[in-house]
Amino acid sequence: MSKTDVVEIEGTVIEKLPNAMFSVELENGHRVLAHISGKLRMNFIKIVPGDKVTLELSPYDLTKGRIIWRDK
């Protein structure tokens, strides 16, 4: 899957789950299960509930995503 196929959307972290997974509520009210991207993991970026994040969603499965950016 190329990067042009992904959907970028913003949301708010609702809760932290085991194995670096997060429950994220999108701006439209839907909830998504998301994991951290490799760059955030390598740079030890901490994500806590309440943080605004940017997600990449696959057009094939809109219930799972990857957190690619944490807003300040």
From Swiss-Prot:
Residues 1-72 form the S1-like domain. One of its GO terms (cellular component) is cytosol. GO terms for molecular function: ribosome binding; rRNA binding; translation initiation factor activity. The keyword Protease does not apply. It is found in: Cytoplasm. SMART domains: S1. InterPro entries: NA-bd_OB-fold (IPR012340), RNA-binding_domain_S1_IF1 (IPR006196), S1_domain (IPR003029), TIF_IF1 (IPR004368). Keywords: Cytoplasm, Initiation factor, Protein biosynthesis, RNA-binding, rRNA-binding. Belongs to the IF-1 family. Component of the 30S ribosomal translation pre-initiation complex which assembles on the 30S ribosome in the order IF-2 and IF-3, IF-1 and N-formylmethionyl-tRNA(fMet); mRNA recruitment can occur at any time during PIC assembly. One of the essential components for the initiation of protein synthesis. Stabilizes the binding of IF-2 and IF-3 on the 30S subunit to which N-formylmethionyl-tRNA(fMet) subsequently binds. Helps modulate mRNA selection, yielding the 30S pre-initiation complex (PIC). Upon addition of the 50S ribosomal subunit IF-1, IF-2 and IF-3 are released leaving the mature 70S translation initiation complex. NCBIfam families: infA. This is Translation initiation factor IF-1. The gene is infA.
